From Swiss-Prot:
Belongs to the complex I subunit 2 family. Keywords: Cell inner membrane, Cell membrane, Membrane, NAD, Quinone, Translocase, Transmembrane, Transmembrane helix, Transport, Ubiquinone. The keyword Transmembrane helix applies. It comes from the Bacteria. This is NADH-quinone oxidoreductase subunit N. InterPro entries: NADH-Q_OxRdtase_suN/2, ND/Mrp_TM. It comes from Protochlamydia amoebophila (strain UWE25).
Amino acid sequence: MNPTLTLTDFISIGPLLIVLMTALIIILIESFSENCSKKWSSLISIGGLTLSIFAVWGGISSNHSSLLNPWIHFDTLARFFTVFFLVIGIGASLLATAFFQRFKASHGEYFFLLQSAVFGLILIGAAADLLTLFLGIETLSISLYVLCGYMKKWEISHESSFKYFLMGSIVAGFLLYGIALVYGAIGTTRLDVLLSSYQTISLTTEKVLFFSGIAMITLGLAFKAALVPFHTWSPDVYAGASNPVTAFMAVGTKVGVFAAFVRLFFEALPQFDAAWNQVIDTLVYATLIYANFVALKQIQLRRFFAYSSISHAGFLMIPVVIGNQEALSALTFYLVIYAIATFGCFAVLAYLDQNQEGVHFSDLHGLFSRSPWLASLLSICLLTLAGIPPTAGFLAKFYVFKVAFQAGYYGLVIVGLLTTILSSYYYLRIIGILFSESKNDEKLPYSMPAAIVGTTSFIAIIILSFYPAPFLKVLSHLSN
């Protein structure tokens, strides 16, 4: 009997198909009508992503007995991440619209690349095989290589794009070689049988091959997450890319990589090896300590948010080390809060961004007197990232510390608490600058797309800060 794709298969991958079709429509419009592209590409991008969200729910009952299940599996967790990625794509599209309104650049190809990146993210979240995971990561990465150098007149953009491409290409080799070693050891790359296959092998050589393969895959993911010492690309790339690209990398890439960690270490290899956990512990310690100390010295905001993002990656790795159901709930809640607050910060930067040099701390002096709303928005987002009560950021960090303490990882709890105190200093320092005496009375231009992102972030933070119980209940059900 020849396997064929059925209607059920197409419904189950509906979000992927819609994102792919949206990307093709955008590039066709850009190819044949540049004027039409300038007017409609952003709307088509947002519309396609929104339609994909509805398609997720349309495929809820259609993920069984699918021919694609060995490669792509839209289970409950995959649907959660898919919706998450699509919302991130909508936010990035709105910030890009605000950016192009200010800089008057051609942008049809930009939204095509953004859709391609979201396509890669969805593949990661729904991956049922290491090869699918690799394809998703590389689809995302290749799109970002081009997006980072999208502003052709910005020399710094070219430099950051080339650096990211060069280092990312090397890491892709590590990922693929790691997958090859795993296949050589156990004869499969399917995530659902990795652990059982590993436990059946008896030869020391095969165990070494398997362990080496997992180590190389983890190294590749650590690079994508910008964990210390694999972080060196991140500050330069964040500083050199445009504001919407940096926002998408800080949120989309981070969530995508941790979706890959979830698939690998929560589902395929839960509590894989005690010695391997010690290696990841070391990465967490190094990331938390180094990133927070270096962030103290930054004066350019995009570079500052690069180190802030590295620091948060360290916190996000704590639940990965623990690897149980409650840790998964803590991880997903932290990811959501981090994404909302980061988008809010970049919505403010969309108002302040003037050129390729980006926004410096000095540009924030007296922002409250120029725009009380923007200063308040940035303040609440920074307080959330710092984890200061009563914001949702405090709840997210508390949840992570709670599961770490219950699992006996006292060292991670102590280092996490100390670095949280340190990070509070540099976040509060920025807030102090916002409310200082103004050195510039120039009015800021209004941007509807950035205002939508900022207002949505503000409302979401307020709701999750004071009424998080329903959302936490959903995440608890998700992890079970």
